[in-house]
């Protein structure tokens, strides 16, 4: 997890860790990066007019067409890097606040090049690992593990995710 010192000195992004239930199985929603050669969670910049969870929810809708219930508080903080590692100065690090979001509906994403794809937790880890340095890969694996723990917690406590706020759309998951 990102240290508090790093969190204070790096730019901030927000991510929606989108999931759905398929019977007793959990699937995560990944999108292609802008370059198209890596997979990631829907994420992006904060907006002073929105809470961080609302900004993450916006990213899920724009990049993946995902509509659902997002937790108002982050469940994890992780480091992410953009750029190319083999060029000096080619990488920008970010601290990312991760928000868990259960998806109820899908629509056409605003960013059509993102190719939203549902995958198992193991497949998510495999896809997230491609083309990444080990330290960032471990950060993303930890996001999946923490998300699964949180989902299990919700299942044990409430029997499912507590529905508090759901956006609207025309297509179901």
Where are each of the predicted segments found?
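Short connector loops at helix/strand junctions that flank enzyme active sites
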Residues: 9-14, 34, 91-96
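Short, charged/polar surface micro-motifs in flexible loops or helix N-caps
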Residues: 22-24, 35-38, 47-48, 79-82, ...
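Short aromatic/basic micro-patch
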Residues: 40, 93, 118
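Charged phosphate-binding loop/patch that engages nucleotide di/tri-phosphates or the phosphate backbone
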Residues: 129-173
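Active-site segment of metal-dependent pyrophosphate-handling enzymes
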Residues: 61, 65-107
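Conserved N-terminal beta-strand and adjoining loop/helix that marks the start
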Residues: 2-28
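NUDIX/MutT-family hydrolases
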Residues: 98-141
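Conserved Nudix-box catalytic region and its N-terminal flanking loop in Nudix hydrolases
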Residues: 25-69
């Amino acid at each position: 997890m990102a240290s508090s010192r790093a969190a204070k000195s790096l730019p901030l992004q927000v991510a929606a860790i989108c999931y759905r239930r398929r019977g007793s199985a959990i699937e995560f929603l990944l999108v292609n990066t802008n370059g198209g050669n890596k997979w990631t969670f829907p994420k992006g910049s904060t907006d002073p007019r929105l809470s961080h969870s609302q900004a993450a929810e916006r990213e899920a809708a724009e990049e993946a067409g995902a509509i659902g219930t997002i937790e108002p508080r982050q469940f994890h903080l992780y480091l992410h890097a953009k750029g190319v590692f083999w060029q000096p100065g080619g990488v920008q690090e970010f601290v990312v606040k991760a928000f868990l979001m259960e998806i109820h509906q899908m629509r056409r994403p605003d960013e059509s090049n993102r190719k939203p794809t549902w995958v198992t937790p193991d497949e998510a880890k495999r896809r997230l690992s491609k083309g990444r340095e080990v330290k960032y890969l471990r950060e993303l694996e930890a996001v999946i593990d923490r998300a699964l723990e949180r989902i299990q917690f919700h299942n044990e406590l409430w029997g499912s995710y507590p529905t508090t706020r759901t956006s609207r759309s025309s297509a179901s998951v």
